Amino acid sequence: VMPDTDILVIKGVGTRPLYDANPEDPTAPRDGVISFPAGQWNSQQTYVIANSESGMLLDGADTPPDVGEGSEFALAVAWPYRLQIYYIRDGATPTLSRKILAWDAETESMSIQTEDLVQGVENMRFRFGYDSNDDGEVDTLAYLDDITAWNQVTSLQVFLLLASDVVDPSYMNEKTYQLGDIAVDKEYLELYGRPVNLRRILLHSDMTLRNPRLVLRGSG
């Protein structure tokens, strides 16, 4: 990983869960086996199997737990699990890369795999907007190390610094690139051993995050 760059870990689930039986049909027979819709269980996928009280990660090649009434995972639902880790991979040419949880055909198991996305990305910085007083509006901007309540994060600013892979001996980059709270200038580049005579461009994007609040209530 390139020093002094951010790493973003995204964990989530798919939008099409699997059930013991059709949840819209109260008369459908239930046997405690996750099998609806039929034929959708994928042995090359990881699932989050959870009800309101218990949850677990399970590879699809393994045997899922009993979800029948009276079991630990009674009426649990299986959600396809997603894991993505974005970072700048160090090297002669820095690269925006990501690690994902995916099926490995060679080992016939789930594993963390690396994908290179964009070459020439030297730095990546994230600034988050969050609603600290629960009034529905972003009121605070903060960086990764300063976020304490991730369920309140509702927006994201992304800064990417890209560099050419061709050194121009006649060009000396004297610019300062502001990636949020980090100023990348000639001294910064020299500190991390990056060529100064590369042409660079700073990209910035704002996005809204879907971050619903989940509240679980039990009967008294």
Describe every region a protein language model picked out.
Residues 207-209:
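C-terminal functional modules
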Residues 1-159, 165-199, 204, 216-220:
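N-terminal pilin/flagellin-like segments and related low-complexity appendage regions
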